[in-house]
Amino acid sequence: MLETLKKEVLAANLKLQEHQLVTFTWGNVSGIDREKERIVIKPSGVEYSDLTADDLVVLNLDGEVVEGSLKPSSDTPTHVYLYKAFPNIGGIVHTHSQWATSWAQSGRDIPPLGTTHADYFDSAIPCTREMYDEEIIHDYELNTGKVIAETFQHHNYEQVPGVLVNNHGPFCWGTDALNAIHNAVVLETVAEMAYHSIMLNKDVTPINTVLHEKHFYRKHGANAYYGQS
């Protein structure tokens, strides 16, 4: 069942270590088959070096396990909520990558300071508000998804494929699991670039709007011309 999706999600999870986005087991990737209404996600606490396609857990859109003998990621309710809230995404990544998490712990958006950021995100990468005690105590992971969706009332999730959860870390998404990994790598890279830019020039300002839009829309949208497609 869902063998192709399992292979993709396995490959994406293994890329977390390849791209140095995780320490120990501090991250997870999922993918969704919209037609079959099934989600495939990493099991909780399993080392990446031990992970196989057979270890991955298959869920329905209520977050219930329909295949697999292991417990799904503890972040499963967040993934499930985001798949419902963002109907055009096909994969989700959560990590505690150091640079993006530093911004999340500071409670700050990552400002768009250059064209690397502009190539992938059409605005600042937002940081969510702090969660209320009641949201943390009851249904914490579900409420994490809700606070992300709340943040994207003011952003286009397809044009800003990532977010910083306040005091926690980044979530990224994409057209599929591997594309979500790509966006997570970019987010980590621009998080580091932004930090160093601010350290070098405390008065640095966001990229010129015209330049930002030029770089974003030459790669995205109906008139994109970057690449070979």
Swiss-Prot record:
Pathway: Carbohydrate degradation; L-arabinose degradation via L-ribulose; D-xylulose 5-phosphate from L-arabinose (bacterial route): step 3/3. Induction: Transcription is repressed by glucose and by the binding of AraR to the operon promoter. L-arabinose acts as an inducer by inhibiting the binding of AraR to the DNA, thus allowing expression of the gene. GO terms for cellular component: cytosol. One of its GO terms (molecular function) is aldehyde-lyase activity. The keyword Lipid metabolism does not apply. It catalyses: L-ribulose 5-phosphate = D-xylulose 5-phosphate. Substrate binds at G27, N28, S44, G45, S73, S74. The active site is at D119, Y226. Binds 1 zinc ion per subunit. The keyword Metal-binding applies. GO terms for biological process: L-arabinose catabolic process to xylulose 5-phosphate; pentose catabolic process. Keywords: Arabinose catabolism, Carbohydrate metabolism, Isomerase, Metal-binding, Zinc. Its cofactor is Zn(2+). Transmembrane segments: none annotated. Zn(2+) binds at D75, H94, H96, H168. Its EC number is 5.1.3.4. Involved in the degradation of L-arabinose. Catalyzes the interconversion of L-ribulose 5-phosphate (LRu5P) and D-xylulose 5-phosphate (D-Xu5P) via a retroaldol/aldol mechanism (carbon-carbon bond cleavage analogous to a class II aldolase reaction). Belongs to the aldolase class II family. AraD/FucA subfamily. This is L-ribulose-5-phosphate 4-epimerase.
